[in-house]
Amino acid sequence: MTSEQVRGAIRAFVTQNSEHTWSGRAVARIFHGIASPNFPAKQWGRVRSAWRSHLDVDFNLLVRMATQEVLSLRRGRYSIFL
């Protein structure tokens, strides 16, 4: 999977779940299937399109990419209605 495909998946995920305030680390944790108190596996494991969907991408790289995309969305660089 290319970095642009991963970035597209990040943007789609964040916009589809815009009721949450996302950080790059939170998105990366979902994409790697790592539960947290705010994003428990019991709830987010049902989101098959995202949970554990990018295990092939280095976690720290995914955090950096997700942080960049989340900030871009917040700044209005992308339309919230993709």
Q: Which residues fall in each region the model found?
A:
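Accessory DNA-binding and partner-docking regions appended to nucleic-acid-acting proteins
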Residues: 1-82
